[in-house]
């Protein structure tokens, strides 16, 4: 994915000149990917992204600690998968100006951003997104995440979405429309600081895979799954493994007729 001339070179400082503004790329995929020595990136304001449709892996495995991309024109972008993945040094990320109304793929967008302490995505229009799998995988420093405004009506894939978000104590998914969701395996695996999780709005009628979905949620005190329709589920293996703080769990309504494991 990182097919650029400066790929993985030990660049510490990168400057975009004003003259570069005349260039209007259609893809910035992998542009700064693998620059794991980079500590300074200047002149991003001279990068015209108005024609860009593909930003996958753009800052993947990059050593930058702060990124302000609030000025980016992302109105044409459809692909943001792995855009910031494995950028383990990133502590601050400003995406407040992002128009993601055309984006369909957010797979692993923030995967491995293990130093990110806060993330404001309240302005995100996710109405076209179909894949959110691994989106926040390994964001182990995030303590709260409000995704209540996310439109997930087209999303089929949410597996590993919050995998190993170990510091997360507040997670708001109250606006989630999961009518098309088929994959939610390991969705909350390793969210060991969550004491509560409200999934009362979840429609699971199309879900096939629920294995390890709550595995390792060691602080979870209660879990109400009364609304869960499991009639299509084929896999439930290790679904509640390690949920050592749960004192009661009512699964009497679960339809397990299709379950194989």
What are these regions (language model features)?
Residues 2-6, 23-33:
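Extracellular beta-strand-rich solenoid/capping regions of secreted or surface-exposed proteins
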Residues 29, 56-57, 81-82, 107-108, ...:
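Register-specific detector for alpha-helical tandem repeat solenoids, activating on a conserved position
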């Amino acid at each position: 994915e990182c097919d650029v001339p400066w790929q993985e070179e030990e660049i510490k400082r990168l400057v975009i000149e004003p003259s570069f503004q005349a260039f209007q790329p259609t893809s910035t995929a992998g542009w700064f990917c693998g620059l794991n020595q980079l500590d300074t990136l200047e002149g991003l304001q001279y990068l015209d992204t108005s024609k860009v449709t593909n930003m996958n892996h753009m800052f993947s495995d990059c050593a930058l600690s702060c990124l302000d991309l609030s000025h980016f024109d992302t109105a044409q972008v459809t692909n943001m998968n792995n855009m910031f993945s494995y950028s383990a040094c990133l502590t601050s990320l400003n995406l407040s100006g992002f128009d993601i109304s055309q984006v369909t793929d957010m797979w692993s967008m923030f995967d491995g951003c293990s130093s990110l302490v806060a993330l404001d995505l309240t302005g995100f229009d996710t109405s076209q997104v179909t894949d959110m799998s691994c989106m926040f995988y390994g964001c182990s420093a995030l303590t709260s995440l409000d995704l209540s405004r996310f439109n997930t009506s087209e999303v089929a894939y949410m597996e590993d979405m919050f995998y190993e978000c170990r510091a997360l104590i507040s997670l708001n998914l109250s606006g989630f429309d999961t009518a098309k969701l088929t994959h939610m395996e390991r969705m909350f695996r390793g969210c060991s600081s969550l004491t509560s999780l409200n999934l009362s709005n979840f429609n699971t009628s199309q879900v096939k895979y629920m294995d390890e979905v709550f595995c390792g949620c060691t602080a979870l005190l209660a879990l109400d799954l009364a609304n869960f329709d499991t009639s299509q589920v084929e896999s439930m293996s290790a679904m509640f493994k390690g949920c050592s703080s749960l004192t009661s769990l009512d699964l009497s309504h679960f339809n397990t007729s299709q379950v194989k494991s």
